[in-house]
Design a protein with these regions (language model features):
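Alpha-helical scaffold domains
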Residues: 1-160
Length: 160
C-alpha cells in the first residue's frame, strides 16, 4: 500500500487541505491529504479501468495506461484492507465501489466498508451506477441500513 499512498500524496493540494480540514472538524487534520474531489475521482476511474475486479460479465478489455500496472493489480488488496487512515483513502475506496459494474460485488464491498465511513463527505460521495439497475434488490438493504443504530449505514440508506 506504500505505493498507493505515494500516488495519493502526489495529487496533494496543500491549500485545499487547509480549506477542507475546516469543513470536517471531526477528522483530524493530519488524516487529510488534500486532494480535490475531481482529481481523486479521475484517479479512481483510472485504477478501476485497469483492474480485473471492475470488468463486466462481457469481459471488457483491461486497460491500465495512465497509472502503473502494479497499482491496478493492487486495487482489490486496497479494498480489502480496512480501515484506512486517510480521509482520501476512504473517498478513493467509495469512488472505486462506484465504478463496479457487478451489483453483488459492489454491494458486498459497500457493506464491508460501511462501518469504516466516519464522515458525511464520504457517505454522500455517490452511488454505484449499477445500483440503479437493481432498485428492488437494493431496497431490502436500504431498509436494513435505515434500521441500523449507527449513523453511517442510515446515512448511506438516505443517500441512496
Amino acid at each position: 500500500m506504500l505505493a498507493e499512498l505515494e500516488n495519493l500524496f502526489a495529487l496533494q493540494d496543500k491549500n485545499y487541505r487547509e480549506f477542507h480540514a475546516r469543513l470536517m472538524p471531526n477528522i483530524e487534520k493530519e488524516r487529510i491529504i488534500g486532494i480535490r474531489v475531481p482529481v481523486l475521482r479521475k484517479y479512481a476511474k483510472e485504477l478501476a479501468h485497469g483492474s480485473r475486479l471492475f470488468l463486466s460479465v462481457q469481459k471488457e478489455k483491461r486497460v491500465c495506461n495512465t497509472v502503473k500496472e502494479n497499482d491496478c493489480d493492487n486495487v482489490e488488496k486496497f479494498l480489502n484492507t480496512l480501515p484506512h487512515y486517510y480521509y482520501e483513502e476512504n473517498n478513493l475506496h467509495m469512488f472505486l465501489i462506484m465504478q463496479m459494474k457487478d451489483y453483488d460485488t459492489a454491494l458486498a464491498y459497500l457493506e464491508a466498508f460501511l462501518p469504516y465511513i466516519d464522515n458525511w463527505a464520504t457517505c454522500d460521495s455517490g452511488v454505484p451506477a449499477v445500483f440503479k439497475k437493481h432498485k428492488n434488490e437494493l431496497l431490502l438493504n436500504v431498509y436494513k441500513w435505515l434500521d441500523s443504530d449507527k449513523p453511517t449505514p442510515s446515512g448511506m440508506a438516505l443517500a441512496l
